[in-house]
Every structure is written in C-alpha cells, then in structure tokens.
Amino acid sequence: MIETFRVGRYAMRYGHFVPRLYNYCRSLGFERQRMLPSRAFCSDESQGYPVMLLAQHFGTFPFDHGRVGGKVAINRHGPYAHHGEDLVLIQASHVGYNPDDGRFGVYQRHRTEGCRFGDCCGKLCGVLRWYEDEYAHACRQVQCGRLDGEPVFQIDNQYLDDSRSEGVFLRLDRMVETPPQPLTVLSTSKVFRAGHSIRERLGEACFGETPAPIGTALSPELFHFRRALAEGPEGHDLLEAALAPVMPALVTSPHPALDAARFVTQAEFDRTYRSILREPAFATKNVLFVSGLNIDVSPREGFPFPFTKFVPWAAYARLCDGRSFLLEQEQLVETLRRMPGENPDCLSFDGT
C-alpha cells in the first residue's frame, strides 16, 4: 500500500500549493468570505510556515484539527462546521529531509545549542525506535550456517518462546522445514534445517560453514511484532496503533520515517473520509478534504523558515449542489497544477 503513494515529481512548494488550492476551492464555488480552512498537522514548529501561508491566502487563521503525528481529531468536525460555510480541511503528516546527504526523517534545530540535527517528527520517530531496536537485535540473534553440509538456521531461544508479551515473532513456517524439529539443541539456541523456498530465495552462499547473522535478509514476510500499546494521558497511543500492521515493512525500509509518514497519511485520509460521510454537521456545508505529506527541509542560513514541500495524496469533495467525488493522487496533482499559481485575494500581513 505504501508504495502507491508516490513522491518525486508529485511534490510542490508550499508557496505554489496553497494559492492553487485556494483557486481550486473558488472553482468549486466556495466563497472568499465564507471559506474556513482547517489544518490537521503535527504540533512541531516546522509546520508553522504552512499554517502562515494558509492564513495569508485564505484570509483567516485556520481551525485546528491536528493531533501529534498528523492524526486528525475527527471529534472536532462539529465545532469546525459551526465556524464556516465553505470548509477546507488539509491533513498532512510530515517528514524531514536533508538534501546534503539524502536522509529522510531529520531536521536541523537552529535554536538548540550547536544547531544540531534531530528527528523531524519526534513522535513518529519515537514510535519507530523500539521496533527498529527489536528488529536489529533479531537480525543478530538469528544466524545462517551449515550443519553436516546442510543449510540451517541457528535461532536464539528467545525467538522460539511464543508466550512472550512483546518483541519480534518469527514466522518459522516460512523459514524452517515443517514441522519445526531442532537438529541440535544448544545452551541458548536451537538449530533447524532451512526450508526449501527460503534456501532458494537467499541462495546457498548465505549459508556458510561458520554461522553468521541473517542481517537484513530477515525480510518483512518472515516476522511480525507483538507489543502492548502504551497508555498515556489521552489513552492508547493512536499513532502506534495505526502503524502497527506495517511495522515489519517500515523497519526494513531504507527510509523508515518517510514510509511511516506516507502510511499515516494514507490511513488518515481513509479514516477521515469515512467520518466526513457520517458527520451530520457537514450536511449543509461545502466540504473539501485534502490529504498529503509535508516534507520539511531545514532553513538555510539567512532564512527563518523551512523550505517545505507538499505531496498530495487524495482529496474528497462534498458540495451543497449534490456533487461528491474523490480525486486520487494523479488526478489531484493534475487538477492543482491546472489552477493559477497567483492568488489575487492574498493578504499582506502588513496591511492587516
């Protein structure tokens, strides 16, 4: 699913995206004095510049639908609907990017000692960290080797204990001959004959005479995670719950933070779309919901704000004239790019 959300040529500067979005709203019949945008962004300060652009182009400060990590507070639909007639909800997860080394997930904090780089979305990266550490440990503790010339896996006893409450759980039926019967029992591990299909996939060279960690050959289809969700002041961790089904794909990705942000955007669009369908407060309103990804590039020297790009994912419109429709990524990007890049109604903050 994550791969269907393409980035590359679909990204556009926020300074181009917002006026095009405004002009698209006007083309749908939304009126300047009745429009109220709402943003569902993370609370990170890097998201401030997009909020400023929304205020400048729509002529009013946006309502706030955002929760940490870019989750949408769908329980705010009612209050939001009472504040405007033509409603424009923009949801975006965010991820940092350092163009100097091509890393996603990082952001330079210019107001810290030493202006050091750190996680861009601390919540998203914080959720990932436990899973990344557990995966890295499993990559070391599951080893490939040979016993009497036969390809085998030497598996730490920890990963053979299904009664554990959390951690990496191997899909043994995809790794070893079934039913799993150890060839040798060692002090802290057991040795199993490797299954035929995985031997073909990994190649005979992966099974050397001296046991070696399986490493990144421990691919997503060979394991899953189990973990009790953390309980915080707002209940269970909603972001972690959303990411849990795709954690094996995320921890094995070359860009975990990017893929996590893409998946959250996809999941939030689907969830919020369904909440809009059922929201009675929207029944007499024009509603446009746009979802995407904010890519934050740290401010360069001499510039106060980040260079932020928006990657559209999908949109849904439900209008008072009875029309309703979805725009998938390709359609949405093409629609926005057809819109004028200038907004004649754009505010001058000095003049307000």
Feature roles, as predicted:
Residues 90-92:
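Short, surface-exposed ligand- or partner-binding patches at beta-edge/loop junctions that are enriched
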Residues 1-35, 59-60, 68-88, 97-352:
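Divalent-metal-activated hydrolytic enzyme cores
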